[in-house]
């Protein structure tokens, strides 16, 4: 018996919707990253993007434990001298509510071209509305 290796023609992708309201950021991100990678499927193949599409709604109502709203700092650098910018989580969620979920999930998928393809299948929305009703997404419990 030959070992099964998935390829683009054998993969069947599904759409899932996740409600982030009241969910802890890291616990939500691990489940979403696993679905994006395709690890929830018995046909998972490491070198093929076999994951499904994930829609995250209510990202602005995500929960952080402890004092992380003040203590968790996100860094970015412009490339110039003294170009380091520090932004606490509570300021980042006001500027761009979807950024917390996107950054958490992006850190949990491979940092390669395959990982970029996986990340393109993630859609994060701040509120309860999304524009993917035509894909008939299934609810995914976290």
UniProtKB/Swiss-Prot annotation:
Recorded GO CC terms: cytosolic large ribosomal subunit
Oligomer status and interactors: Part of the 50S ribosomal subunit.
GO BP: negative regulation of translation; translation
MF term (GO), any: mRNA binding
UniProt entry tagged with the keyword Cell cycle: no
Keyword flag Ribosomal protein: yes
Gene designation per UniProt: rplM
UniProt keyword annotations, A-Z: Ribonucleoprotein, Ribosomal protein
Role description: This protein is one of the early assembly proteins of the 50S ribosomal subunit, although it is not seen to bind rRNA by itself. It is important during the early stages of 50S assembly.
Protein name from the UniProt record: Large ribosomal subunit protein uL13
Family: Belongs to the universal ribosomal protein uL13 family.
Pfam families assigned to the protein according to its UniProt record, in alphabetical order: Ribosomal_L13 (PF00572)
Organism from which the protein derives: Acholeplasma laidlawii (strain PG-8A)
Alphabetical list of PROSITE patterns matching this protein: RIBOSOMAL_L13
Domain of life, source organism: Bacteria
């Amino acid at each position: 018996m030959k070992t099964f290796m998935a390829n683009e023609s054998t993969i069947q992708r599904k759409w899932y919707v996740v409600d982030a309201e009241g969910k802890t950021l890291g616990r939500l991100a691990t489940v979403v990253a696993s679905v994006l990678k395709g690890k929830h499927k018995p046909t998972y193949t490491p070198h093929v993007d076999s994951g499904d599409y994930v829609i995250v709604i209510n990202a602005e109502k995500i929960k952080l434990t402890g004092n992380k709203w003040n203590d968790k700092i996100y860094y970015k650098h412009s490339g110039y001298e003294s170009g380091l910018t520090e932004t606490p989580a509570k300021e980042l969620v006001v500027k761009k509510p979807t950024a917390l979920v996107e950054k958490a999930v992006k850190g949990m998928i491979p940092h390669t071209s395959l990982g970029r393809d996986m990340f393109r299948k993630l859609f994060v929305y701040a509120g309860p509305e999304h524009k993917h009703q035509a894909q008939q997404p299934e609810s995914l419990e976290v």
